[in-house]
Amino acid sequence: MKIIQTENYQSMSKLASQHVINTIKQLNKPVLGLATGSTPEGLYQHLIKAYRMHQISFANVSTFNLDEYVGLHKEDKNSYHYYMQKFLFNHVDIPYKNIHLPNGIAKDLSVECTSYEDRIQQAGGIHIQVLGIGRNGHIGFNEPGTSFESQTHVVDLDESTRNANARFFDSIDEVPNQAITMGIQSIMRAKEILLLVSGSEKAEALEKLVNGNVSEEFPASILQTHQNVKIIADKAALQDISYHHFSETM
């Protein structure tokens, strides 16, 4: 596990984008695992900028998102389909057929979960998975207590997670109670994991990830066992972690 400290959110986002850009350039058919929320927005802005400057193309890129709310149509402004179009896909040359997100309005959610796993495997697996971390240690929508053996599944959202996401909705009552999420085993199959952490409000969770015990009660702790994890975090998020943990390079 490498930890790279940056000065602030902006430098975290830029460094993350440089790493993703290098990955895209190195591979013939790169497969990216993508996340939503406020943390990766800066990363996506830098990727769009690189595309507009003709530094990269997404023509051969395939993407798989971590999760989607159950019950929200892809055109709903709070769906993750909508988020990804708004913050990345509408601004680059990625073919529509290469974009994959769970279908939160599928008639049979169990079949959708199995199908999503199959699509990831058919694409050859994920080369680099972008992650954030929740204050309770969730990754994707895998809440505390989720089995480390879990694959893509439907999850009941923890109240703390719904409260954290309420800022994106008109009220807490509009936040869905369920989501489809890649499971922890699904995430761990990625060849590389890129965890982005920013802000003092994530410091306690990040310290627990780095120094705590591996436990299903803190899902992100499983990342300690992955062979290729890079954490890019700003100073505020790293305030509880001693400097000797840090790496100078990617």
From Swiss-Prot:
Keyword entries, A-Z: Carbohydrate metabolism, Hydrolase
InterPro entries: Glc/Gal-6P_isomerase, Glucosamine6P_isomerase, Glucosamine6P_isomerase_CS, NagB/RpiA_transferase-like
GO MF annotation list: glucosamine-6-phosphate deaminase activity; identical protein binding
PROSITE patterns attached to this UniProt entry: GLC_GALNAC_ISOMERASE (PS01161)
GO cellular component term, pick one: cytoplasm
HAMAP family: GlcN6P_deamin (MF_01241)
Similarity annotation: Belongs to the glucosamine/galactosamine-6-phosphate isomerase family. NagB subfamily.
Identification of the protein by name: Glucosamine-6-phosphate deaminase
Chain's gene name: nagB
